[in-house]
Amino acid sequence: MKKLLTLLFSLFVLSSTSVFAEWTKIYTDDEETIYLDLNTLKENLGSIYWWNLVDLKEAGPDAELSGKVYMQGDCAITRTKLLTAISYSQPMGEEELDTRTPDDPNWNFQPPDSIGGFLLDTSCKLLNASAKERERKF
């Protein structure tokens, strides 16, 4: 019985990360890879909300190798707010370093040819897409 409980606990721990986030790669270049958790795309009162994960190819100035950001977006006028930023010392959001939540975040307008514009546009398009449509895009 004790072995069974140990096995079940181990399986729970190993699978708990995927329960909370299902990261889908949406962008990559020489410096970073950006993922979106499709399960967190939500709409409320004209804004959309989502979590992104950024994996850096080289450590940043504070020794971070990855970060998660919770964003608010306005699809109509292409602007975003960063609501929470969490930095990690390991790839894929492992070993938390710091969490920052601005008291009164500002709106930032995103040019269409920027990474921020791409992320907002992608999130807006995926918000109302069916599961099959989401799979086809990635």
Residue ranges and their predicted role:
Residues 4-15:
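Sec-dependent N-terminal signal peptides
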Residues 18-69, 74-138:
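N-terminal secretory-pathway/extracellular module detecting exported/lumenal segments
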